[in-house]
């Protein structure tokens, strides 16, 4: 981002976040994440808003946002899923952070201008920094997708759907078996696509009701997130690349 590359290096013994100058690799800053993060797998989010560019890192036991220029901590949230994999993303001008492991599966929706410890609770799921949150509803491997008014999450064989603005639950339903969602969900043309490691692609009609409309056999497992470009959806299976109009 603007001649910066940011790397998350969350080795449990010596975790750190480092920013390098993209043009020559010079280290611009480095911050220790000791006692901040033991595990983190997702790609950091870089988001620019109101003159501040922040780096949001999903992690456990803390989700933390840093100032891209200095590495200074901006805001943090404690105690999500203990093996966070989904990458943070922006929709509706807010930052969505999701995890699900170790008995916890939160969704946090954060205002970019948040500062300090903004950890929500069961009794107070929103605050000055958090638009809404739920302690049960996140996904383990798959990064969700916001499409229209709703956020869709693939968690193993379950599809979860919430109103993306209010957090109101729309549905939590099982896909036709077998199904296990590793890849991130994608959406286009009024449809949600959930690629399964059980050699199929489940297609749902977008909206607040659970409406599966197809289960397409692919012949091979799918672990990679589908890509959509110029009216074509691309699926990378374990052995093939498939393009469908």
Regions found by a protein language model. Name each.
Residues 134-206:
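Loop/turn-rich, solvent-exposed surfaces of beta-rich toroidal or solenoidal domains
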Residues 1, 10-14, 30-52, 58-60, ...:
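Extracytoplasmic beta-rich repeat domains
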Residues 13, 61-63, 102-103, 157-159, ...:
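Loop/turn residues immediately N-terminal
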Residues 21-24, 67-71, 111-115, 163-167, ...:
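Short loop/turn segments that connect beta-strands within beta-propeller blades
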Residues 107, 198-200, 206, 220-245:
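Blade-level signature of beta-propeller repeat domains, shared across WD40, Kelch, NHL, RCC1
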Residues 4, 53-54, 94, 150, ...:
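Conserved core beta-strand positions within WD40 beta-propeller blades
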């Amino acid at each position: 981002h603007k001649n910066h590359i940011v790397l998350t290096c969350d080795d449990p013994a010596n975790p750190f976040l480092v920013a390098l100058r993209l043009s020559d690799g010079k280290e611009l800053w480095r911050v220790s994440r000791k006692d901040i993060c033991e595990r983190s797998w997702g790609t950091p989010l870089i988001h620019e808003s109101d003159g501040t560019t922040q780096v949001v890192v999903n992690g456990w036991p803390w989700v933390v946002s840093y100032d891209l220029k200095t590495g200074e901590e901006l805001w943090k949230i404690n105690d999500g899923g203990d093996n966070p994999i989904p990458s943070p993303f922006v929709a509706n001008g807010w930052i969505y952070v999701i995890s699900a492991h170790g008995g916890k599966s939160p969704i946090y929706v954060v205002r970019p201008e948040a500062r300090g410890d903004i950890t929500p609770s069961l009794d107070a799921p929103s605050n000055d920094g958090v638009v809404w949150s739920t302690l049960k509803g996140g996904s383990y491997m798959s990064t969700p997708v916001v499409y229209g008014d709703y956020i869709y999450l693939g968690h193993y064989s379950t599809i979860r759907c919430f109103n993306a603005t209010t957090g109101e639950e729309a549905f939590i339903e099982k896909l036709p078996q077998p199904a296990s969602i590793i890849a991130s969900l994608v959406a286009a043309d009024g449809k949600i696509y959930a690629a399964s490691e059980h050699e199929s692609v489940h297609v749902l009609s977008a909206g607040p009701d659970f409406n599966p409309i197809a289960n397409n056999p692919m012949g091979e497992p799918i672990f990679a997130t589908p890509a959509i470009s110029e009216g074509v959806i691309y699926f990378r299976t374990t052995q093939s690349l498939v393009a469908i109009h």
